[in-house]
């Protein structure tokens, strides 16, 4: 199982580059850069990371088909991959209606079909072939004007529901959302046949289980609200009525931390003392997870987070 780190999107862009260098020095396999709206642009940060590092893999997770024309995504990815000398993995995902439609005014229709269409078009352009067809409703007649001196980046899809997971079979891998449990990873692997699975994971350990719990509780409650009743919460063992309460609290703008139990947190995050946290990491390995991406909490010192994560993974 590969180990990766994801600098928080609200970190200064230059700081994110420094953190990536620290992750490389600490022996991490990959660094993942998110593109959440409206935070720092992932391609700019990835270019900085590519120029400042020499070994570590660089993942962008994920870019959506709505805000960037397919030609622009191919241009950016190919150029970034050249700087990285073939170390880039490009993650593509459908995003969500709140960001696209409510915030940016972009119609959010047929997200899965749009993502699949867009992914195929990006792959065509990155392979050096000409694209001559409708892509997301636009007639595209184009090809890259240059031939990169390295293989094209891997394409992975950020997906979570059964329909999206089934549609991702043509990708080089899948990126699972935060709070993917070992049970969910195992289900994805066995049900959909995905062999290279990456997942964002919340990690918070301390000398006592209670301290580790407190540091991760607010984020766990928030993301449980985001997922609501779904395969992610079901495979983590949450009854539908419990998962629904987290969703209701999020929509009402109220904290749901009081709904959490130690069992719930342990099912979706790496937390507690070192023994319990290491056991959860081992469960991820046994589930078939290919890459565990530790999410930066945006508050703690990055060096300490990197040290703790590396200590938990028996590699």
Where are these regions (language model features)?
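Active-site-adjacent structural elements that line small-molecule/cofactor binding pockets in enzymes
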Residues: 1-315
